[in-house]
C-alpha cells in the first residue's frame, strides 16, 4: 500500500497525516476530501526555492479546481523566522481578504510551517491551516504536533502558539529535490524516534540495504520511516499536547543541540546536525550516570555517522554552555531537565544532572 | 454581600471573576487563594496613568508578600495597541526571565488587557495571565471572554488569539479615578447587555435613583450592574467561546460602531460612544424590518442619552460605510451579519439586511 494515514488523536482537534508519493499533484482532490469547500480562500505560504520547484503547478491545480488561491513567499533561513516576516504575511492576508472561513497552507520546510502555523493561530484570532512539509525534518517533526512560532532576537521559538493543523499532507517525492545534507539532518530526528521509543525503527535503520535504499530516496522505504516517526510523535503528542510532561522526551538531544546551534553560530550546523551531536552528548551523560550501556551509545554513534551526521563535540567555552542551557525555555523553576536514554527505545526525564557531569565534555 | 464571584464555565479553561471593592489592596492574598505560588515570576503590564495611581502600592503588596514581580508600562491609546508594543513586552519578558511557569497580570483598561492577554498567549507558546480591569468598559466587556490581540494598521483586532485568563479581579474603587466620559462609554456596554439579554438590568438602569447612585459611583450599585453584565457575558461565552454562533450577539451595535470609529477618526468618539450610536442605528434597522417597536427604540435612546451617550448619527459618506462594513471581520462568506433587537432583552442575528435599508441613515 502506497498511501498511509496516521491519526493524531486530540479530541476535537484531531487530524490525519496523509503520506503518499505524488499527493502534491492532486492537492485539490485531497482538500475536497477533508471538507475544504471551493468558496474558501486559500493563502499558500512558501519560500522562493520551493515555489520555483512546485509553486506554479500547485497553484494551478488549486485554480483549475476553482479554488480562490494566492501564494506569498517568505525568505528562507532562520534569521527571517521573526515578527517582521509575520507582519508581512498579515499584510498579504489583509489585502487578499483572508476571513475567518479562509485557510492557510504551509508549503515548505520547518520555517515555513512554523511561521504559517503561527500566522494562522493569530490572524482574526485563529483560522484553519494545513501543513505540507517538503523536507525530511519537517515531515517527521515540526509539521505534526502543533508547535508554531517565530524567533525572538534573543532565542529561538520564544514567541508562538500551540496550534494544531487541520491536516498534514506529505509527498516523499519532494525529498528528491532536497540537498543531501538536509536529508541527513532530517535523519537525525528519525534516529531520535528510534532511540526514544522505537527499537524496531532503530534496527531497521541499521540494516545496510535499508540504508542504501533510503539514501537513494526510494519512496517505499521513505514512507516506512516517515510513517514510523510520525506514529511515535502522534502517540506522544496525543498524551501531552502542551508539553507539561512526556512530550519533553521529543527534545532528546535538543538541549545540547541548541547550545551548539547558538554558540557555533546559526548556519554552521544544520538543526539536525546539532541534534545529532546533542544525542551523542546526552548518551555520554547517560553513561556517566550509569543509565545506559557503552555498546548502545556506540551503536547510536555509528548509526548517526552512517547517515553522514556529525557526532564530535565542537570546542565550546564551558561558561557559555551553562548560560545557554539556563536560558533554554525547557528550564522549569530554575532546574535543568535532560532526556537521557536507558536503552535503545526508552528514555526518561532527569532533573538531577550535576553541571560537572556534562561540562567535562566541553573544552 | 460585598464580594461577588462569577464562574465562567469553559471546561478545563473555566475561571472565576471576583468582584469586590478594595480587592486591589489585597492582591497577594487573592493570588495565593487561586494557587499562584510565590516562586512564580509575575510580570505586571500597565500604563503610566494607571501605574501612577495604583502601581507602586500594587507592586509593593506583591513584593511584601515575597512575590518576584516586575512592572512594564505600555503607552496608552489605540495607536499603541500594535505589534511593536507587543515586541517591547517580549523584550522585557526575556530580560526578566519569564518562564513557562510565570504569570502575566494585566492592570489597566481594555488595551492593556488585550495586549497582555495576547502576550501571554504567545510567550513560550502560552503562559497564564490574570485580568485586573480598571475601566468600566474593560470590567464588563474585554476582561472576560478571552478575546486578546493587537491592531493591524488596516484594522482593529485583526491579529490576536482566544486566550482565557486564569482569573479576573475587579475593584470598583478604581472607577473613582476614571474620567466621567469614560465611565459613560462603559455604560454603553452595560446597556447593551440589557438590550440583548437582560430586561431586568435595562429596567434597573432606567430607574432615576439607581442612575444617580451609579453616576456617583456607589460601590453597591456598581457591583450590581457589573455583576449582571458579566453574568450575561459569561453565559454567552460559555456557550460559544470562539464566536461561531451566539457569541456574535455581544457585538450588538458594534458593526456600525466600528464604521463610526473608523470614519470619524479614532479618538473623536470613544469606543462606547460609537457603540451607543451603533445601537441606535441597529434599532432603527430593526424598526425598518418590522422586528422591533418604536417605543422600545425610544426607550433605548433615552437610556443611552441619560448616561451622557451620543445617539445621533454623524455625517458619513454612504460608500465609505459599505467599504468598512465589508472589511469587518464579522463578514462571513461575503455576507454581512447584523444583530437586531426584537424586544428589550432579546436580539437575533440576521444576514438578510439590504444595503438600502441602513444606507438611508447616512448622508
UniProtKB/Swiss-Prot annotation, chains A, B:
- List required co-factors: Co(2+); Zn(2+); NAD(+)
**Keywords of the record:** Amino-acid biosynthesis, Aromatic amino acid biosynthesis, Cobalt, Cytoplasm, Lyase, Metal-binding, NAD, Nucleotide-binding, Zinc
- Identify the metabolic or biological route this protein is part of: Metabolic intermediate biosynthesis; chorismate biosynthesis; chorismate from D-erythrose 4-phosphate and phosphoenolpyruvate: step 2/7
GO MF terms on file?
3-dehydroquinate synthase activity; metal ion binding; nucleotide binding
Q: Which reaction does it catalyse?
A: 7-phospho-2-dehydro-3-deoxy-D-arabino-heptonate = 3-dehydroquinate + phosphate
Which EC numbers does the record give? 4.2.3.4
Q: For Zn(2+), which residues are the binding ones?
A: 189, 254, 271
Q: What are the GO cellular component annotations?
A: cytoplasm
Q: Which GO terms describe its biological process?
A: amino acid biosynthetic process; aromatic amino acid family biosynthetic process; chorismate biosynthetic process
By sequence similarity, the record places it as follows:
Belongs to the sugar phosphate cyclases superfamily. Dehydroquinate synthase family.
Q: What is this protein called?
A: 3-dehydroquinate synthase
Native species: Prochlorococcus marinus (strain MIT 9301)
Amino acid at each position: 500500500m502506497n498511501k498511509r494515514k496516521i491519526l493524531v488523536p486530540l479530541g476535537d482537534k484531531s487530524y490525519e497525516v496523509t503520506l503518499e508519493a505524488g499527493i502534491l499533484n492532486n492537492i485539490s482532490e485531497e482538500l475536497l476530501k477533508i471538507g475544504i469547500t471551493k468558496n474558501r480562500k486559500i493563502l499558500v505560504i512558501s519560500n522562493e526555492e520551493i515555489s520555483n520547484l512546485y509553486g506554479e503547478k500547485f497553484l494551478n491545480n488549486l485554480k483549475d479546481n476553482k479554488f480562490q488561491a494566492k501564494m506569498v513567499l517568505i525568505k528562507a533561513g532562520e534569521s527571517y523566522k521573526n515578527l517582521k516576516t509575520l507582519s508581512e504575511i498579515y499584510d498579504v492576508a489583509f489585502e487578499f481578504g483572508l476571513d475567518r472561513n479562509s485557510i492557510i497552507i504551509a508549503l515548505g520546510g520547518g520555517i515555513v510551517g512554523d511561521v504559517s502555523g503561527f500566522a494562522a493561530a493569530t490572524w482574526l484570532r485563529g483560522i484553519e491551516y494545513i501543513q505540507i512539509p517538503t523536507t525530511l525534518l519537517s515531515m517527521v517533526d515540526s509539521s505534526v504536533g502543533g508547535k508554531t512560532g517565530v524567533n525572538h532576537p534573543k532565542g529561538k521559538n520564544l514567541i508562538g502558539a500551540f496550534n494544531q493543523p487541520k491536516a498534514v499532507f506529505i509527498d516523499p517525492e519532494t525529498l528528491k529535490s532536497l540537498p543531501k545534507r538536509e536529508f541527513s539532518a532530517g535523519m537525525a530526528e528519525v534516529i531520535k524516534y528510534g532511540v526514544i521509543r522505537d527499537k524496531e525503527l532503530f534496527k531497521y535503520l541499521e540494516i545496510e540495504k535499508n540504508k542504501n535504499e533510503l539514501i537513494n530516496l526510494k519512496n517505499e522505504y521513505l514512507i516506512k520511516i516517515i510513517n514510523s516517526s510520525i506514529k511515535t510523535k502522534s502517540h506522544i503528542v496525543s498524551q501531552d499536547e502542551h508539553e507539561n510532561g512526556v512530550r519533553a522526551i521529543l527534545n532528546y538531544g535538543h538541549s545540547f543541540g541548541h547550545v551548539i546551534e547558538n554558540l557555533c553560530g546559526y548556519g554552521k550546523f544544520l538543526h539536525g546536525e546539532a541534534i545529532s551531536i546533542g544525542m551523542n552528548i546526552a548518551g555520554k551523560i547517560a553513561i556517566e550516570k550509569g543509565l545506559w550501556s557503552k555498546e548502545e551509545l556506540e551503536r547510536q554513534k555509528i548509526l548517526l555517522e552512517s547517515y553522514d551526521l556529525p557526532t564530535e563535540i565542537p570546542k565550546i567555552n564551558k561558561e557559555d554552555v551553562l548560560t545557554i542551557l539556563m536560558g533554554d525555555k525547557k528550564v522549569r523553576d530554575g532546574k535543568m531537565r535532560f532526556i537521557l536514554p536507558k536503552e535503545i527505545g526508552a528514555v526518561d526525564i532527569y532533573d538531577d544532572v550535576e553541571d560537572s557531569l556534562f561540562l567535562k565534555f566541553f573544552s
